[in-house]
Amino acid sequence: MKRVLISVSNKEGIIPFARKLVHLGIEIISTGGTATLLREAEIDVMEVSELTGFPECLEGRVKTLHPVVHGGILADRSKDSHMKTLEELKIKPIDLVVINLYPFKETIQKKNVTLEEAIENIDIGGPTMLRAAAKNYRHVTVITNPEDYHAVLEEIEAKGNTEETTRYELAKKVFQHTSQYDTLIAGYLGKDELVFPEQLTVTYEKVQDLRYGENPHQKGAFYREIGCEEGTLASAKQLQGKELSFNNINDANGALALLKEFQEPTVVAVKHTNPCGVASAKNIDEAWDKAYAADPTSVFGGIIAANQVIDAETATKLLEVFLEVVIAPGYTPEALVLFKQKKNLRVLELSSILAEPKGQMDMKKVLGGLLIQEYNTGLIGNLKTVTEKEPTTEEIEDLLFAYKVVKHTKSNGIVVVRNQQTLAIGPGQTSRIWALENAIGNCIHPLEGSVLASDAFFPFKDCVEVGAKAGIKSIIQPGGSMRDQESIDACNERGMAMVFAGVRHFKH
């Protein structure tokens, strides 16, 4: 290895790396700010403009886009014709390319960044050189991440060059990196448009490998959507406990999505992504009491999410139950000390717990493809009473509460509520009446004076009849069935109120 080209925006570790290369007798070529930095560190360096005989121009937009640079990178050393051309054109081979790109991601994450600022941080020459070096990996080593400096130096020191297997792995990293870079740019430029493009490319960054996937025989990992981390598990801080599992993250996400529906102090308990206890109250301690009382059996081994700081009083109660995860915007110091009694309990802090994520698309993988839709951010359309009896103010509050919960319950879903507390939840049934019967059958509370929410319309009046026998007084459903009038008449005959929400909330 004789020659390296270095041009980096991330200067981490570059000085000791370059100094070692010089010690190994490798000539350094560099550009602009990187060359200045290396010279200040008393490292010998040749400017790219000296190599090409052509100055940097257009305020630095054109630095390395030159045949002398790309010929030196792309020449296939195994072909005599390529090497003869280099000799005729007096082009020197470049054996190592060290580049990281303009910080486009960091730029667009700044508050109030302008389009002009973002555009100026779109790298052109960098990706071109990276791709050229990666294409010619049989002869050229390419580095785009400072984490690879040490391993590459070790190989050069030991063998005078890198192994082809190493160059191949580094080349793969380059194409992943440049693909992600271009996807970020395309996403940013189209961020104000909700469109379904003819070709879709998405980019995520790995947060962590997981012990396994949904089941022990499946491998798994967790990735974050770049630029959409605020208010999501990707930005949560784990304060204690075992490593998060695939199912922990999936269930915690379900709890978090439901919690975002509420502004008042609320606790959400989730099991297998379905809510099993939800309650609002004047404070988090009381909300937990109500959420736990809703279904103390199902909450065992569940996920708890709260939208206010958890104090010692609430923490003491949480410790009485076996829980997998607790997530909240914060904890008092006393609460954190108490949680240490259960070292395996995963305690997550998410200060922006009520912030709405910036991502616009909801995606579901299917065999051979991907389903994409807008996020379900609405709750109701025009709330309309369709029965002779009007619901009371208190009943309307409970109806809306129940509709928020059923929106996040697997279809067919039924939720029964009284006083801002779930009493019965029937999720994921293939028949709506079965969902109601399941909810009532597993309920430990009297249902007199409660309200019922259904995620979709009643195809028959049977849910009204069964609900009335259980003591339910008011119902909220989207409406839209050809048999709506049968359900309305059944309510009128029983003195019940029914409102149409105008918006369906299937969840699969």
Swiss-Prot record:
**Where does the MGS-like domain start and stop, copy by copy?**
1-144
* Naturally occurring in which organism (per UniProt): Alkaliphilus metalliredigens (strain QYMF)
Keyword Lipoprotein assigned to the entry: answer is no
The pathway is:
Purine metabolism; IMP biosynthesis via de novo pathway; 5-formamido-1-(5-phospho-D-ribosyl)imidazole-4-carboxamide from 5-amino-1-(5-phospho-D-ribosyl)imidazole-4-carboxamide (10-formyl THF route): step 1/1; Purine metabolism; IMP biosynthesis via de novo pathway; IMP from 5-formamido-1-(5-phospho-D-ribosyl)imidazole-4-carboxamide: step 1/1
Q: What is its EC number?
A: 2.1.2.3, 3.5.4.10
Q: Which GO terms describe its molecular function?
A: IMP cyclohydrolase activity; phosphoribosylaminoimidazolecarboxamide formyltransferase activity
Q: Tell me its family.
A: Belongs to the PurH family.
Q: Which GO terms describe its cellular component?
A: cytosol
Lineage at the top is: Bacteria, Bacillati, Bacillota, Clostridia, Peptostreptococcales
Pfam families, per the entry: AICARFT_IMPCHas (PF01808), MGS (PF02142)
* NCBIfam families per UniProt: PRK00881.1, purH
Q: What is this protein called?
A: Bifunctional purine biosynthesis protein PurH
What sections of the sequence does the record tag as coiled-coil? none
Q: Which HAMAP family match?
A: PurH
Q: Which UniProt keywords apply?
A: Hydrolase, Multifunctional enzyme, Purine biosynthesis, Transferase
Q: Does Nucleus count among this protein's keywords?
A: no
